[in-house]
Amino acid sequence: MEQDLREAVLRESLPQDAEQLKGLWCDVFGDPPELVDAFLSLLAGMGCGCVAEHDGRILGAAYLIHGFTLLQPGKAPLRCGYLYAVAVRPEARGRGLGAAVSHWAAELCRFHGAELICTLPAEESLYRWYGEILSLTHTSTRKVFSRDALPAGVQPLEASEYLRRREALLCGIPHVLPNEAVMDFEAALCRISGGGLYALDDMIFFAYPDKGRWVIPELLPLSAAGRIPGLNTEVLPYLCADRPLPEGLVWNLTFD
């Protein structure tokens, strides 16, 4: 028998929601409980959650990460929001809960001071969906490097040291600065997946193994991609060139 969800309540998540949120996340995304525990333990420092609740049961959730700041030379910093991990229980899908929690999360993000909101949809088909419900424009350019093995000589980095070096390497380049809690979660995500944050000479990157290869979502400085042999991708020309990024492009960081 189909539930009548018209009386579902949208609200900000509370600490006592942790077990239900963890169960929903694991059921929908299949991630290990350790990863969800790490995320929820850091959430207060990164942002907050939005839930759709019906009769005491959480049927949908979305998270807004507002621990990002857009830095552009000559311009005032902008607080950024990142919509993350939108999930709805299978039995409650098709009735607008995903759109409702996403829209409410975006509004909550603005309430917390975000002047710019972005997201990284899990599937190509979702770009249009997010564009319609949140009035977002598809503007991303993205390359993920991969390699059979990490190069010799890499050294692990703590999140705080990675963040310090990252800021030095991106000085003068339009980029998004994560706060320490966001960087801690990025480190936890990589560590739980079998990887981490690394340095090699003057380069920094984070990486994790996936299906027999090492995935490298971020690699700095911008010229570093041409200095590590074995990357199995056609690197965008400006990543290997000694020249500025194209006008309007911002170096971002996302949770993969």
Question: Where in the sequence are the language-model features?
Answer:
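Long, hydrophobic, well-ordered secondary-structure blocks that form the structural core
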Residues: 105, 114-143
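Active-site rim helix/loop that mediates acceptor-substrate recognition in acyltransferases
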Residues: 18, 23-73, 171-197
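Conserved acetyl-CoA-binding loop-helix of GNAT-fold acetyltransferases
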Residues: 85-88, 94-109, 222-232
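Amide-forming acyltransferase catalytic core, primarily the GNAT-like/NAT-type
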Residues: 136-217
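Conserved beta-strand in the GNAT
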Residues: 51, 57-67, 80-87, 118, ...
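Active-site/acyl-donor-binding loops of N-acyltransferases
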Residues: 131-153, 211-256
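Conserved GNAT acetyl-CoA-binding A-motif
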Residues: 102, 109-122, 232-241
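Conserved N-terminal entry element of GNAT/NAT acetyltransferase domains
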Residues: 1-16, 148-159
